[in-house]
Amino acid sequence: MFLNYNKSIDEAEKIKNDLINKRFDNIKIEKKVVNEDPPLPFNLVKLQSYCSSHFGYNPADVMDITQSLRETHKAITYNRSDCQYLSEEHFKEAPKTLAQIVQNIKFKPSELDPTIHSKCFNDKNITAHFAIIPTNNKVDLNKLTEREKNVYLAVCKYYMAQFLPKAVKEKTKMTIELDGEYTLVAYSTVVLKKGYTAIFKDIKAEEVTELSSIADGMYSGTAIDARFEEKETKPPSRYTKATLNEDMTRIAKYVTDPEVKKMLLEKDKDKKGENGSIGTSATRSTIIDSLITKGYVAEDGKRLISTELGRELYRILPDEIKKADMTAKWWAIQEDIPVSYTHLRAH
């Protein structure tokens, strides 16, 4: 229950010995009720990540599947969107859309309420597009392939979640100050009301302990036992197609030049969910597949690994080309083109 990170074995052993049979008169219990919003509807990157983790589909496949759902079956809205928000006009259309979805998938959550106004309905966060949602067209699930059906149902579920109550949880935190030198902390969460989570079978259960049964306040007690776990730090996980695809939406975090980082972030200032990105929703999966096709990157199961050819190319490239900084500079040049063109036409 107690957490203590980055301690040597000797330090951990000392803390453990200090704790056993020690009397504490400063055990603080804090409780807080939290209302949890449903996840936003999908944009393409989020949908690709979801389908990778739940169905094993790679990003390019999801692009093709959503293209078919949109063009052939008229089942979903524009599929290459980089936005997770909807307009107030969409909210007005919700009763009709929900009624058709319920008819299409033969499922209606008991608490579904088209008058619930979730945070996804915000005109200020709309870009050139809006979130990927079901249309109000009739869709015959029997005419969809298994992959199309899985993706369509995921889009429906995330849209319907916007019209379900928030999940209500009670979070309990226990804090013990150890001689002013260490702080020991334990947490427990209990779900008071499932709300939207009732339709998400894949959500991990909250860790509930006896701590949740203790009321707010200060307590005294004696530690009867203590132990620690010895673990080694792990290197960052290798990318999969989906995680690389998603990380390309926030490449600015890898930029060290503050001016260039500012430029990248400025590029995406009106895009919720993208923070200094490279590529677009429509091109990122193609870029990744191109690296594989050209032999610079290979797949090891789901993991992506650099090839000898890729590492050699990286070695001989100029440092400037290797950095995300170049994307910001290219963007700045492209921004100047329309201005210059307009100036030329005016003269």
Predicted regions and their residues:
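Core structural elements
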Residues: 37-42, 64-75, 116-135, 286, ...
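Short, amphipathic alpha-helical interaction segments positioned at domain boundaries
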Residues: 99-105, 312-334
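Conserved small/polar residues in nucleotide/adenosyl-binding loops
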Residues: 342-347
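Accessory beta->alpha helical hairpin/"wing" motif in late/C-terminal subdomains of nucleic-acid enzymes
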Residues: 80-98, 282, 286-290, 294, ...
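Long, highly charged, low-complexity internal segments
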Residues: 1-71, 103-104, 123, 141-278
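Extended, well-ordered alpha-helical scaffold/bundle regions in very large, multi-domain proteins
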Residues: 57-115, 306
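Generic beta-strand/beta-sheet core signal
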Residues: 45, 60, 72, 78-81, ...
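A glycine-rich phosphate-binding loop feature that marks nucleotide/adenosyl-phosphate handling sites
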Residues: 68, 87-88, 114-118, 168-181, ...
